[in-house]
UniProtKB/Swiss-Prot annotation:
Family according to the record: Belongs to the hexokinase family.
Originating organism: Saccharomyces cerevisiae (strain ATCC 204508 / S288c)
Phylogenetic lineage: Eukaryota, Fungi, Dikarya, Ascomycota, Saccharomycotina
Enzyme class: transferase
Catalytic reaction equation(s): D-glucose + ATP = D-glucose 6-phosphate + ADP + H(+)
Phosphoserine: residues bearing it: S2, S470
PANTHER family: GLUCOKINASE-1-RELATED, HEXOKINASE
PROSITE patterns: HEXOKINASE_1, HEXOKINASE_2
Protein name (record): Glucokinase-1
Length: 500
């Protein structure tokens, strides 16, 4: 066989292998139907009392955590409140001034979480919450020095705490950590009340005036923030035809929340439900924690790459399997694993004779960000030069034009699967709550936050296409308005503190 023939045969083998992988990543309309039906089933199961012997930490179903928020803002609320937000990489403290006209202003300070708090398994709760309190003190010195100087005589300042990890929440201001997901490994925090841990450190560091009155997460915050800033929140009375029904995040992680009828949240004690209904409260926000959807893998599409990422590379094997197929944290990692695999099969990057010779960035888990994929996704330059530069900059990886064509195909298959799967919880919630049929026109708004839904090219279009292919159908999809909700974790937490 001549060199040319060998080259063509290899090229055909590469195309065949890549096409097969792309097929494995396809989510068909039938699969969307199956997943949506199962999601609704898991929601119902999660709203019911847990089976005997089951806990939120051990259960593989949807957590469906009551957020103890029974109303949504309408944009007329006023006041100055504090908000703290512990995410996967940063801690942020804000002072939010609600103006009462759907607008707000904010002072904020963001701090990177030190690597030793993330990586060291010997770190304690006191280490972490001590760091949060020190950053809060620095913020108070800068923006509220007068209140700080008054000490115990200062007027209480309400703080809403956005804590974006699964908690077993028992009231608006208490919740115990179920498990860490992104980043942290601090074992002694699991099972403890995170509000109490933060409050103790605030008091210990001379800030008794700060009262942590509400525990929320970024998703509930996104929903509340969208309700506050949306002109359609009072649509029932204003005559507008759309209203906010879901808050969701598609960023580093993914999650969502929605308003559920209190009568249907049978996991809440009967006396509490009766008390709330007597007070005229009919609905409560449910934090779905949908990153955990189908942890048993009964229906989720699964490739060998998903298995490796979950079992060998993630910090929480067996959990958050939906998130590992959808969120920005994992999109680049899926591509990286595919490239390493295709190299090992002798199909791509053959200038490197062995895995050991591959660029270190390519063999290091989580080195390839979804931002790189977003550049490749829309590259239409000659010879895919943009892709070439992106791979050189991010991975120090030289590629041929032929390889780049195949890599772009893979990127588009990975992102399409992510967007199609992202449509499943949205379709399921809209169907379960009958949101599209509640009144004439029945148009709804979904408040979205997160880098993937906001910035990834074509993600929202692909998500909408999947909604049209889902049981909602094209007619249902047309009634859905996806809106970017800005800064849910700051404003939303402040709004949570306001209702406390």
């Amino acid at each position: 066989m001549s060199f040319d023939d060998l080259h063509k045969a290899t090229e055909r083998a590469v195309i065949q292998a890549v096409d097969q992988i792309c097929d494995d990543f396809e989510v068909t309309p039938e699969k969307l139907d199956e997943l949506t039906a199962y999601f609704i089933e898991q929601m119902e199961k999660g709203l019911a009392p847990p089976k005997e012997g089951h806990t939120l930490a051990s259960d593989k179903g949807l957590p469906m955590i009551p957020a103890f928020v029974t109303g949504s803002p309408n944009g007329t609320e006023r006041g100055v409140l504090l908000a703290a937000d512990l995410g996967g990489t940063n801690f942020r403290i804000c002072s939010v001034n609600l103006h009462g006209d759907h607008t707000f202003s904010m002072e904020q300070m963001k701090s990177k979480i030190p690597d030793d708090l993330l990586d060291d398994e010997n770190v304690t709760s006191d280490d972490l919450f001590g760091f949060l309190a020190r950053r809060t003190l620095a913020f108070m010195k800068k923006y509220h020095p007068d209140e700080l100087a008054k000490g115990k005589d200062a007027k209480p300042m309400k703080l809403g705490f956005t804590f974006s990890y699964p908690v077993d929440q028992t009231s608006l201001n208490s919740g115990t950590l179920i498990r860490w997901t992104k980043g942290f490994r601090i074992a002694d925090t699991v099972g403890k009340d995170v509000v109490q841990l933060y409050q103790e450190q605030l008091s210990a560091q001379g800030m008794p005036m700060i009262k942590v009155v509400a525990l929320t997460n970024d998703t509930v915050g996104t929903y509340l923030s969208h309700c506050y800033t949306s002109d359609n929140t009072d649509s029932m009375t204003s005559g507008e035809i759309s209203e906010p029904v879901i808050g969701c995040i598609f960023g580093t992680g993914t999650n969502g929340c929605y308003m559920e009828e209190i009568n249907k949240i049978t996991k809440l004690p009967q006396e509490l439900r009766d008390k709330l209904i007597k007070e005229g409260k009919t609905h409560m926000i449910i934090n779905v924690e949908w990153g955990s959807f189908d942890n048993e893998l009964k229906h989720l599409p699964t490739t060998k790459y998903d298995v490796v990422i979950d079992q060998k590379l993630s910090t929480n094997p067996g959990f958050h399997l939906f998130e590992k197929r959808v969120s920005g944290m994992f999109l680049g990692e899926v591509l990286r694993n595919i490239l390493v695999d295709l190299h090992s099969q002798g199909l791509l990057l053959q200038q490197y004779r062995s895995k050991e010779q591959l660029p270190r960035h390519l063999t290091t888990p989580f080195q390839l960000s979804s931002e790189v994929l977003s550049h490749i996704e829309i590259d239409d330059s000659t010879g895919l030069r943009e892709t070439e530069l992106s791979l050189l900059q991010s991975l120090r990886l030289p590629t041929t034009p032929t390889e780049r064509v195949q890599i772009q195909k893979l990127v588009r298959a990975i992102s399409r699967r992510s967007a199609y799967l992202a449509a499943v919880p949205l379709a399921a919630i809209l169907i379960k709550t009958n949101a599209l049929n509640k009144r004439y026109h029945g148009e709804v708004e979904i408040g979205c936050d997160g880098s993937v839904v906001e910035y990834y090219p074509g993600f929202r279009s692909m998500l909408r296409h999947a909604l049209a292919l889902s049981p909602l159908g094209a007619e249902g999809e047309r009634k859905v308005h996806l809106k970017i909700a800005k800064d849910g974790s700051g404003v939303g937490a402040a709004l949570c503190a306001l209702v406390a």
